[in-house]
Swiss-Prot record:
SUPFAM superfamilies the UniProt entry points to: P-loop containing nucleoside triphosphate hydrolases
One example GO MF annotation: ATP binding
Assigned EC number: 7.3.2.3
Organism of this sequence: Marchantia polymorpha
Superkingdom as given in the UniProt entry: Eukaryota
Name of this protein: Sulfate/thiosulfate import ATP-binding protein CysA
Annotated family: Belongs to the ABC transporter superfamily. Sulfate/tungstate importer (TC 3.A.1.6) family.
Amino acid sequence: MSILIYKVSKSLGNLKILDRVSLYVPKFSLIALLGPSGSGKSSLLRIIAGLDNCDYGNIWLHGIDVTNISTQYRRMSFVFQHYALFKHMTVYENISFGLRLRGFSAQKITNKVNDLLNCLRIADISFEYPAQLSGGQKQRVALARSLAIQPDFLLLDEPFGALDGELRRHLSKWLKRYLQDNKITTIMVTHDQKEAISMADEIVILKEGRLLQQGKPKNLYDQPINFFVGIFLGLLIEIPKLNESITLKNIPSKTPQNLKKFAFDPIWVKIFANRSINKYRFFLRPYEFCIKSEMDLEATPVQIKTIIYKRTFVQLDLFVTSFLWNLTIPIGYQSFRNLHIESFMQTLYIKPRLQVFLRAYPILTNIKKN
């Protein structure tokens, strides 16, 4: 049950909500839509659901053009941020509503609803009404109702936005398994990049109504098409750069010694020998650095400035004396313990794990974040 979106455009007066967006969602896959507020994510979901019309373009569901077909004939469920629960029905009645309309037997309805109540951890509120529920509970009820009818297609707008911590992590893992087991093609909007990377088969990045990049999470994380996509998906660490308009093949004598050392280092400049350093910014992800506490002649010594303990990682603020370079690197707690840091006076050693740059962006065209 695939979804094809072809050159979909939508405007509100002079404001372009969506600008010729095209993407393909393979059957039974989960696609995550990411982008800043106002990028058109929710608007695109509403057009796919048939709740809004597009000014131009087409929506194809499993090979059928449904652009002008009513929502009720699209075999689709959706969960939007307003939940839209029936106020006069209990939680149990809300979830079973679609099943009763479709004429399922009482036993099948009971089994299906009870299973979803337990999996989503809302069995204890099954006879309460929406007005008695918290935002997180309403969100789970809406999700259970959308899953109960076993749709071919599922559209989710921030399905776990009102949840925190362990419950959110548990339900995201459960939902991914459920969608795979029941072969439901899904498009999910989320502002949680980590959630998108862990759940989605592919990620789509939108900005100002335009699709910037689509691909597998690892590909987008490792090889973002531009600086905006790179920094949006996670921390980018910019390496030191020369201030002269030169190439790596022609380092002038007036270049500061520390930067000359950096520029000549074959580890750092492996594949950009023919590019003008002054016109590009070079970046690495935190995991592409190797940090050691033992002396390593192939690594660069660094000073420890601060250590900040976070919930799932430790943030190291370091200073590379030889390059006059401040950098921040998050590492896991086990990796931090392996460093055996006993004092801020202790010297660490750092080097890139890779001998190529995966990310180099022209300064003038990609320096802006918004």
